[in-house]
Every structure is written in structure tokens, then in C-alpha cells.
Curated annotation (Swiss-Prot):
Belongs to the FPG family. Its cofactor is Zn(2+). This is Formamidopyrimidine-DNA glycosylase. A zinc finger (FPG-type) spans 244-278. The lineage of its organism: Bacteria, Bacillati, Actinomycetota, Actinomycetes, Mycobacteriales. InterPro entries: DNA_glyclase/AP_lyase_DNA-bd (IPR015886), DNA_glyclase_Znf_dom_DNA_BS (IPR015887), Formamido-pyr_DNA_Glyclase (IPR020629), FPG_cat (IPR012319), MutM-like_N-ter (IPR035937), Ribosomal_uS13-like_H2TH (IPR010979), Znf_DNA_glyclase/AP_lyase (IPR000214), Znf_FPG/IleRS (IPR010663). It comes from Mycolicibacterium smegmatis (strain ATCC 700084 / mc(2)155). The active site is at P2 (schiff-base intermediate with dna), E3 (proton donor), K61 (proton donor), R268 (proton donor).
């Protein structure tokens, strides 16, 4: 699933090319792509016609277009969703097609059909307007209003693994499996350590590292392990070449030379250095 940097790459592309444009045509090619819009495909199509796109937004992994009727079009990318501008060659996985008033084609392509579009109202949470489905999502480390000290306080009250908390979008959003492993490696913290047992200073360093690694990834177009994670022009990012932890099982740690390990965690894989990031000791009974 795309994480914050990959979603932000898409948002920036949309902001540049669709802001100020009016939607003049919409066609839903697969009903599953609008299953979150409870009123159905016909309602979504009718409500989008002749509506102007006033801007774009993102919180964590959530992406949306703001509209001039005070609604928002939430774009769920899911595992493989793509927002593409211009003509597309392969229409096998085209789920929704829209046309803008300058003739630009805006396509939602989704091979695995976990994503989709949803029209929703905006609500105000902590002084910020967000789509209603995003109201429960915490701010992410790249949000200008992100309160690191507040999140550290929340983490100090959590008696479960720190990696589990990094992945909890109600605690801090946007950090997925890849960037959690990268931030943990940068700070030499094992993801199995209990959040409440970590000093405030270390938790602050971890959140800073998450922001830094995602900023680094954003500068390289995000992380793309296959052709599914692309920008609005269909181009893949290349931060996967710079990963220090994720996907490096059996390779030497770039810092100390120890062999990187992989372990199962929450139906995912965790990658870490056993020397730089030793597992927490299990108390003897």
C-alpha cells in the first residue's frame, strides 16, 4: 500500500494540473470503485458534473480533491490505485474516467480494486477542514501543525510495541511498514520494544527520523517496488534504491556490517539489524 510520500507525490501532481478545472464528464467503469459512495455510481456521476476542483488535500495516506460545492472527493488508492492524467494505453484496469473542461482526461486505474472514489462532506477537526472519513486520522509528521511533543506523550502511555504504534493511524498517520522500519533503523530502536519503556528523547528522535526519511523519499518520487505506485504521469519513484532496512534481509547493515534480519510482525515483515537494533530482553521468570 502506498505510504505518505507516494500519496503526496500524487497530490502534488494533481494540485499542479487539476486545480481550478471543472469536471465536464464522469463515467464509472466498475461499480466496486465507488462502493464507499453509498448513494451509488449514478449519484456520484451526477454530483461531480460541472463541479470545479478548488484544491487538493492529504492527511497521512488519505488523498482528496476539494470542490466548489464544499464537498470533497476522497480518493482511496488502496493497494494499487493510480490517478493518471492524459490518455492511457492499457484500459483493462480503468475503473473511473473523468474529463476536465480543458480536455484533460483524469483516470482512476486500480488493478486490485481495493481503492475507489467517495464524495463526502468536509468537517472541522482541531481547526483544520478534512473530509468526514478522515476525521479520526491523526496528523502526520509532515503536517505543519504536527505536534511532536503531544504524540510523544501519547506514545509514553502505550504498553505495546513501538512499531505497532507507528502503524496506528489514530496515533500518527502516514507511516507504513516501509518507513517505520527505516525510521527504527535510523534511530537504532528495535520495533518490538514497548513504546512506554522508551524515554521521551528517544521517541522524539524516532518521530523526527520518520519525518526525515519520508522527506528523503518524497524527494525521489517515493518508493516503488513494482509498477503499481506511480505519479500522475505514470512514472515510478526510486527511493527503494536508498532503503537501509526494508527488504534487505541477508544483506550487511550499512552502518555496522551485521547481517540484516526479517521477522513476521502483524501479518507483515519487519527488517532490522540485530546488532544496531537488539531485541528487548525477555525477563526471566
Amino acid at each position: 500500500m502506498p505510504e505518505l510520500p507516494e500519496v503526496e507525490v500524487v497530490r502534488r501532481g494533481l494540485a499542479e494540473h487539476v486545480t481550478g478545472k471543472t469536471i465536464t464528464g464522469v463515467r464509472v467503469h466498475h461499480p466496486r470503485a465507488v462502493r464507499r459512495h453509498e448513494a451509488g455510481p449514478a449519484d456520484l456521476t451526477a454530483r461531480l458534473l460541472d463541479v470545479r476542483i478548488t484544491g487538493t488535500g492529504r492527511r497521512g495516506k488519505y488523498l482528496w480533491l476539494t470542490l466548489d460545492d464544499s464537498a470533497a472527493l476522497v480518493v482511496h488508492l488502496g493497494m494499487s490505485g493510480q490517478m493518471l492524467l492524459g490518455p492511457i494505453r492499457d484500459t483493462r484496469h480503468l475503473r473511473i474516467a473523468a474529463v476536465l473542461d480543458d480536455g484533460t482526461a483524469l483516470s482512476f486505474v486500480d488493478q486490485r480494486t481495493f481503492g475507489g472514489w467517495q464524495l463526502t462532506e468536509m468537517v472541522t477537526v482541531d481547526g483544520t477542514d478534512v473530509p468526514e472519513p478522515v476525521a479520526h486520522i491523526a496528523r502526520d509528521p509532515l503536517d505543519p501543525l504536527f505536534d511532536r511533543d503531544r504524540v510523544v506523550t501519547v506514545l509514553r502511555g502505550k504498553h505495546s510495541e513501538i512499531k505497532r504504534q507507528l502503524l496506528d493511524q489514530t496515533v500518527v498517520s502516514g507511516i507504513g511498514n516501509i518507513y517505520a522500519d527505516e525510521a527504527l533503523w535510523r534511530t537504532k530502536i528495535n520495533g518490538a520494544r514497548i513504546a512506554a519503556a522508551l524515554p521521551r528523547r528517544r521517541l522524539a528522535e524516532l518521530l523526527d527520523a520518520a519525518a526525515e526519511v519520508m522527506t528523503d523519499a518524497l524527494g525521489q518520487g517515493g518508493t516503488s517496488f513494482d509498477s503499481l505506485y506511480v505519479n500522475v504521469n505514470g512514472e515510478s519513484g526510486y527511493f527503494d534504491r536508498s532503503l537501509d532496512a526494508y527488504g534487505r534481509e541477508g544483506e550487511p547493515c550499512r552502518r555496522c556490517g551485521a547481517i540484516m534480519r526479517r521477522e513476521k510482525f502483524m501479518n507483515r515483515s519487519s527488517f532490522y539489524c540485530p546488532r544496531c537494533q537488539p531485541r528487548p530482553r525477555v525477563p526471566r521468570v
